[in-house]
């Protein structure tokens, strides 16, 4: 049976994001993936922070200065017979809620681990978010051109700390200065590494067969024998790759290589297009939507202002769940129940915009937006339903924001509300005073907000410390009890950017006491958009 042209397009799509701890090599691997996808001609390494050729996926001013990827951008490229959508996630010391939310828009994740360090803190946090939806995970052990930890130890650590089985697909031969290449367990082939070829796609020499004398000649008898001994162990002690278990998020195929040396990335990409799922079904508040349905549906997972400094616009990123987008089509924005004609949607190669004529499930569209679209908005061809699972996360850090020029209060509030709709930061307005409190998941979000208020809204602001430890969204089914709670706790209540009521706690103890005192009131750590 041949698939219809529409279903062929759906089956070709692979949508994934990269998760890693800062400096594990995520931006470098993004570059190399784009190089293999022929989206860029030569990989400009990120280390050249002084040069003008910044990594293709890092773009706002501040990112350019710091050499870090603050904004989630989207890149589409062809690979083999597939079309791959890569969603870049902020990966530096200070990520934000955007990173979490981007993981709600993908069908698969690539976990990049620095093989000299193993599993690190940020990787653990991001894996927890992928667990909310049992997202399939591929793993790339990076930096084999440096001295690394014992590969078996690395696999054990991933299994024990992240609670996911490891199925090695390739296995390293040596590391650091002695790194010779990798052996593919399922193809019985050895790929030999040449250093100094990181900027281009290299012709790799392949030796067929583990017992081929050419292998001993190529890597040396000692390393060849060590490889054979290690593989005996590996085959006995590790999981075999099983596609069903991978799709259920229970095992992860593991690849070894060096992104900087541009080696091993293609093996991982081959695995990604072969095994990662085509666009998956999605839950709404009324039913499950299948990618094969012909009516268009999609949801907004991120909003970004000022993607083009020359235009003061904001772009909403929408993941297509079902149906085909065609230029000029009319869509229903479910939250407002209004119909809108979408004629100028964008697709992205980071920083380069191009208008798109059509898009399919798994693709990401950019919608021009002048403040009318919010995170979590669902678009359909008329059906009134809302996609679920795109939450706000309770901030962990808080600052009071103060104007240098008190006459600009109106612009400040406008800027903060827009930035909060976009997910750059959360803003809380205490009921009992005129303060403005800004909440974030990571410190860098505060810097981003001040620099964007200045460049986009001409508002100069500074931060002051504030006695807030955490926030929880509150609601209560019993209106009378809720009124009593609000009356007695007025000094600790605030409205967020969307006018939802939140309890602002001065300490975790204070929060616990409030929860005990008011058992009928629900204190939520996340809030559905």
Curated annotation (Swiss-Prot):
| KW GTP-binding (keyword) present | yes
Key words of the record: Cytoplasm, GTP-binding, Nucleotide-binding, Protein biosynthesis
GO annotations under biological process? Answer: regulation of translational termination
Provide the GO MF annotations for this entry: GTP binding; GTPase activity; guanosine tetraphosphate binding; translation release factor activity, codon nonspecific; translation release factor activity, codon specific
**All copies of domain tr-type G, residue ranges:** 11-280
Do you know which CDD domains this protein is assigned to? RF3 (cd04169), RF3_II (cd03689), RF3_III (cd16259)
- Which residues hold GTP? 20-27, 88-92, 142-145
> What domain of life?
Bacteria
Entries under PROSITE patterns matching the protein:
G_TR_1, G_TR_2
Q: Which GO terms describe its cellular component?
A: cytosol
| Cellular compartment(s) | Cytoplasm
**What family classification does the UniProt entry report for this protein?**
Belongs to the TRAFAC class translation factor GTPase superfamily. Classic translation factor GTPase family. PrfC subfamily.
Entry function: Increases the formation of ribosomal termination complexes and stimulates activities of RF-1 and RF-2. It binds guanine nucleotides and has strong preference for UGA stop codons. It may interact directly with the ribosome. The stimulation of RF-1 and RF-2 is significantly reduced by GTP and GDP, but not by GMP.
Question: By what name is this protein known?
Answer: Peptide chain release factor 3
Question: Highest lineage ranks of the organism?
Answer: Bacteria, Pseudomonadati, Pseudomonadota, Gammaproteobacteria, Enterobacterales
């Amino acid at each position: 049976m041949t698939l219809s042209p529409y279903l062929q397009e759906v089956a070709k799509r692979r949508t994934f994001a990269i998760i890693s701890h800062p400096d594990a090599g995520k931006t470098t691997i993004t570059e190399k993936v784009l190089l293999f996808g022929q989206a860029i001609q030569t990989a400009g390494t990120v280390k050249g922070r002084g040069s003008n050729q910044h990594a293709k996926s890092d773009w706002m001013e501040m990112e350019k200065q710091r050499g870090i990827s603050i904004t989630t951008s989207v890149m589409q490229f062809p690979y083999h017979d597939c079309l791959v959508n890569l969603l870049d996630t902020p990966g530096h010391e200070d990520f934000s809620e955007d990173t979490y939310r981007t993981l709600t828009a993908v069908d698969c994740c690539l976990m990049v681990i620095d093989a000299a360090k193993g599993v690190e803190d940020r990787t653990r946090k991001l894996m927890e978010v992928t667990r909310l939806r049992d997202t399939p995970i591929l793993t790339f052990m990076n930096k084999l051109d440096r001295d690394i930890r014992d590969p078996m130890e690395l696999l054990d650590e991933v299994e024990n700390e992240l609670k996911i089985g490891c199925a090695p697909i390739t296995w390293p031969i040596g590391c650091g200065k002695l790194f010779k290449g990798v052996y593919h367990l399922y193809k019985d082939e050895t790929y030999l590494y040449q250093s100094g070829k990181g900027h281009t796609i290299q012709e790799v020499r392949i030796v067929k067969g583990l017992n081929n004398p050419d292998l001993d000649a190529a890597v040396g008898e000692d390393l060849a024998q060590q490889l054979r001994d290690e593989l005996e162990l590996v085959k006995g002690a590790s999981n075999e790759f099983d596609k069903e278990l991978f799709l259920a998020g229970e095992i992860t195929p593991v690849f070894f290589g060096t992104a900087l040396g541009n080696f091993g990335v293609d093996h991982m990409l081959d695995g990604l297009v072969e095994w990662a799922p085509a666009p998956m079904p999605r839950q709404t508040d009324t039913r499950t939507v299948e990618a094969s349905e012909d009516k268009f549906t999609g949801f907004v997972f991120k909003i970004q202002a000022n993607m083009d400094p020359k235009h003061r616009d904001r772009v909403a990123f929408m993941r297509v769940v079902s149906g085909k987008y065609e230029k000029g089509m009319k869509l229903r924005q479910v939250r407002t129940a209004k119909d809108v004609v979408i004629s100028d949607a964008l697709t992205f190669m980071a920083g380069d915009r191009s208008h798109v004529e059509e898009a399919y499930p798994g693709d990401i569209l950019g919608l021009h937006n002048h403040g009318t679209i919010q995170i979590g908005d669902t678009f359909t061809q008329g059906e009134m339903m809302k996609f679920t699972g795109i939450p706000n996360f309770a901030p962990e850090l808080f600052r009071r924001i103060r104007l240098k020029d008190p006459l600009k209060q109106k612009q400040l509030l406008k800027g903060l509300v827009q930035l909060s709709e976009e997910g750059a930061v959360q803003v809380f307005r205490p009921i009992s005073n005129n303060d403005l409190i800004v909440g974030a998941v990571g410190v860098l979000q505060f810097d981003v907000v001040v620099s964007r208020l200045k460049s986009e809204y001409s508002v100069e602001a500074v931060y002051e410390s504030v006695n807030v430890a955490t926030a929880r969204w509150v609601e209560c089914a019993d209106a009378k009890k809720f009124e009593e709670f609000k009356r007695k706790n007025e000094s600790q209540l605030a409205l967020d950017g969307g006018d939802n009521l939140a309890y602002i706690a001065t300490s975790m103890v204070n929060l616990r006491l409030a929860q005990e005192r008011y058992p009928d009131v629900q204190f939520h750590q996340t809030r559905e958009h």
